[in-house]
Amino acid sequence: VTDLAHLPADITPQGFIDAIREAMAGETVPATASAQKAVLVLDGDGGGSWTMGFVGGKLQIDEGLAAAPPVRLTSTVDSWRALVVGRIRERMAEAVGKVAFDPRALARVFHDGARVEKINAFAGDLRLILEDTEAGAEYAVTVTLGGGEPNLAAPTTTVRITMADAVALARREDNLQAAFFAGKIRIEGDFNLPMGIMGAMMS
């Protein structure tokens, strides 16, 4: 079984998807789980697209794009690699100890069908950018809601935070509200989209 906390540095996106399939093979989901699909798109060398959702009480991941998915994540292979085996993972591990990508946590979002329906009420592109000033790099993912095609050139809302401030949040040295009012979380564009999503996730 692949250890998601110690993935090989040269793992490919497809190898990562295979590791998630393996980790989730024995997991079952409640009857309240949503039948909606989510899509992951990684652009760049070795990238691809995958559709994931629950079928027969199990997580199923297929290559390709589902039509009009309610949630679509678009990123680059470089940003993904920073998250699972690179800079983001290293800094978070320093902050909170052992770090592993937990597919169960992501899957739990879809366990509550009613919550997914609330998220379905939103439409637009939410771009999240992590600024790594020490490395002179930025890592980004765009979350597209509502089933439309992503507008990567002009997202509805962009949220920015530095790596140092993200680490402080992970350590619980700061909280989201305080970080926002201190200007550490910067929102450009439609303020209502991220606030509405946060409200739906917490309800």
Language-model regions, residue ranges each:
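Feature captures hydrophobic
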Residues: V1-S203
